[in-house]
Amino acid sequence: MASEELQKDLEEVKVLLEKATRKRVRDALTAEKSKIETEIKNKMQQKSQKKAELLDNEKPAAVVAPITTGYTVKISNYGWDQSDKFVKIYITLTGVHQVPTENVQVHFTERSFDLLVKNLNGKSYSMIVNNLLKPISVEGSSKKVKTDTVLILCRKKVENTRWDYLTQVEKECKEKEKPSYDTETDPSEGLMNVLKKIYEDGDDDMKRTINKAWVESREKQAKGDTEF
């Protein structure tokens, strides 16, 4: 029954209650009056509850501002050393200890690692190192975040072995720079190879100096041959 109808019934019961003189009739009307008032109260509560629900549904959804990570910076500066069990890579990043733990991620494979630091001062930082000099244990490798520093711990697959370089590429580049000496050839031939490399890599002044020394050496040899 609508609230308006209940209100009309209540008014009529009140009128009858005022006119009634017999106790039995008055008790019945009083009980009916209480019943109608309770129904009206329940109707009003239901109406208020529905109104509140409608207002909640009409509220705009809260807008969550996206976390801006800006652009990604590639990390090129780092230091490293080693122990019998680990190769340790040190990366300096100011404030890295203040970002959430889940923002510092490292993925390991047997011959590589990939570091990603997200949302540090509005930027992300990335470092990918492939072709490690020797295999590492993926399960035994880990990271530590210290004050302004990320420490990457690569567990050596074979302990008590020395790494002269961090990567295979670095090793190959360094070995190319070394002059090649063949211990089985004549020492003078090895010296000539070194001089030849210096000549090829040198500037014009260096080439003139070597040419002059070469001519003087040949002249001395020729002079020595004629004295015997």
UniProtKB/Swiss-Prot annotation:
<dbReference type="Pfam" id="PF04969">
    <property type="entry name" value="CS"/>
</dbReference>
<protein>
    <recommendedName>
        <fullName>Calcyclin-binding protein</fullName>
    </recommendedName>
</protein>
<feature type="modified residue" description="N-acetylalanine">
    <location>
        <position position="2"/>
    </location>
</feature>
<dbReference type="GO" id="GO:0030877">
    <property type="term" value="C:beta-catenin destruction complex"/>
</dbReference>
<dbReference type="GO" id="GO:0007507">
    <property type="term" value="P:heart development"/>
</dbReference>
<dbReference type="GO" id="GO:0005829">
    <property type="term" value="C:cytosol"/>
</dbReference>
<dbReference type="GO" id="GO:1990830">
    <property type="term" value="P:cellular response to leukemia inhibitory factor"/>
</dbReference>
<dbReference type="GO" id="GO:0019005">
    <property type="term" value="C:SCF ubiquitin ligase complex"/>
</dbReference>
<dbReference type="InterPro" id="IPR052289">
    <property type="entry name" value="Calcyclin-binding_UBL-bridge"/>
</dbReference>
<dbReference type="GO" id="GO:0055007">
    <property type="term" value="P:cardiac muscle cell differentiation"/>
</dbReference>
<dbReference type="InterPro" id="IPR007699">
    <property type="entry name" value="SGS_dom"/>
</dbReference>
<dbReference type="GO" id="GO:0071277">
    <property type="term" value="P:cellular response to calcium ion"/>
</dbReference>
<keyword id="KW-0963">Cytoplasm</keyword>
<dbReference type="GO" id="GO:0031625">
    <property type="term" value="F:ubiquitin protein ligase binding"/>
</dbReference>
<dbReference type="GO" id="GO:0060416">
    <property type="term" value="P:response to growth hormone"/>
</dbReference>
<feature type="modified residue" description="Phosphoserine">
    <location>
        <position position="34"/>
    </location>
</feature>
<dbReference type="InterPro" id="IPR015120">
    <property type="entry name" value="Siah-Interact_N"/>
</dbReference>
<dbReference type="GO" id="GO:0044297">
    <property type="term" value="C:cell body"/>
</dbReference>
<dbReference type="GO" id="GO:0045740">
    <property type="term" value="P:positive regulation of DNA replication"/>
</dbReference>
<dbReference type="GO" id="GO:0005641">
    <property type="term" value="C:nuclear envelope lumen"/>
</dbReference>
<dbReference type="Pfam" id="PF09032">
    <property type="entry name" value="Siah-Interact_N"/>
</dbReference>
<dbReference type="InterPro" id="IPR007052">
    <property type="entry name" value="CS_dom"/>
</dbReference>
<feature type="domain" description="CS">
    <location>
        <begin position="73"/>
        <end position="167"/>
    </location>
</feature>
<dbReference type="GO" id="GO:0015631">
    <property type="term" value="F:tubulin binding"/>
</dbReference>
<feature type="domain" description="SGS">
    <location>
        <begin position="168"/>
        <end position="228"/>
    </location>
</feature>
<feature type="modified residue" description="N6-acetyllysine">
    <location>
        <position position="8"/>
    </location>
</feature>
<keyword id="KW-0597">Phosphoprotein</keyword>
<dbReference type="GO" id="GO:0019904">
    <property type="term" value="F:protein domain specific binding"/>
</dbReference>
<dbReference type="GO" id="GO:0070062">
    <property type="term" value="C:extracellular exosome"/>
</dbReference>
<keyword id="KW-0539">Nucleus</keyword>
<feature type="modified residue" description="N6-acetyllysine">
    <location>
        <position position="19"/>
    </location>
</feature>
<dbReference type="InterPro" id="IPR037201">
    <property type="entry name" value="CacyBP_N"/>
</dbReference>
<dbReference type="GO" id="GO:0005634">
    <property type="term" value="C:nucleus"/>
</dbReference>
<keyword id="KW-0007">Acetylation</keyword>
<feature type="modified residue" description="N6-acetyllysine">
    <location>
        <position position="85"/>
    </location>
</feature>
<comment type="function">
    <text>May be involved in calcium-dependent ubiquitination and subsequent proteasomal degradation of target proteins. Probably serves as a molecular bridge in ubiquitin E3 complexes. Participates in the ubiquitin-mediated degradation of beta-catenin (CTNNB1).</text>
</comment>
<feature type="region of interest" description="Interaction with SIAH1">
    <location>
        <begin position="2"/>
        <end position="80"/>
    </location>
</feature>
<dbReference type="GO" id="GO:0044548">
    <property type="term" value="F:S100 protein binding"/>
</dbReference>
<feature type="modified residue" description="N6-acetyllysine">
    <location>
        <position position="118"/>
    </location>
</feature>
<comment type="subunit">
    <text>Homodimer. Interacts with proteins of the S100 family S100A1, S100A6, S100B, S100P and S100A12 in a calcium-dependent manner. Component of some large E3 complex at least composed of UBE2D1, SIAH1, CACYBP/SIP, SKP1, APC and TBL1X. Interacts directly with SIAH1, SIAH2 and SKP1.</text>
</comment>
<feature type="region of interest" description="Interaction with S100A6">
    <location>
        <begin position="154"/>
        <end position="228"/>
    </location>
</feature>
<dbReference type="GO" id="GO:0005654">
    <property type="term" value="C:nucleoplasm"/>
</dbReference>
